[in-house]
Amino acid sequence: RGKLEEVFAVLTGSEAALFRHNFMSGTHTLSVALFGVLRPGDRMVAVTGRPYDTLAGVIGIDGTHYGNLMEFGVQYDEVDLLADGTPDLAGIARKCRGAKMCYIQRSRGYAARPALSLEQIEAVSRAAKAVQPDIIVMVDNCYGEFTQKQEPTQRGADLMAGSLIKNPGGGIAPTG
């Protein structure tokens, strides 16, 4: 397991990696990352608009799930994308001041928008870190793994989570 995680860290340009079949889905992996980093009183800002439904439950913004981040005392805010589907860098700079996490959903999810490019992820990271240098830029990279020569962690993201069921597992991984 350790060697596989070392290889995955190299492939993604990351300091370290957790590459485990124990993560049952992308949402499970994202949840582990969010609960591992955020603490009561911290604020996360979703900078690509409202996250998709399963993650909305993890955060607590749908009001139907128990044991979510908001119940844990994490504050939530969001910045919608601009009308053309690109990040609102001015809005990101305004809302990320004082925040612990800048959260980027790279893929379109269930929205009618294009996936974010690495250049856009880098621009978002720069905008957030310009106003809050110690902010953690996290990327939901589900469906984004191995689609380009670099990964978000090589373009300004501090933390990235994805799903083995999708691109890395080629659709044949039984979990993760």
Q: What name fits each language-model region?
A:
Residues 14-23:
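Early transmembrane hairpin of solute transport permeases
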Residues 3, 7-10, 24-176:
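Conserved PLP-enzyme active-site core in the AAT-like
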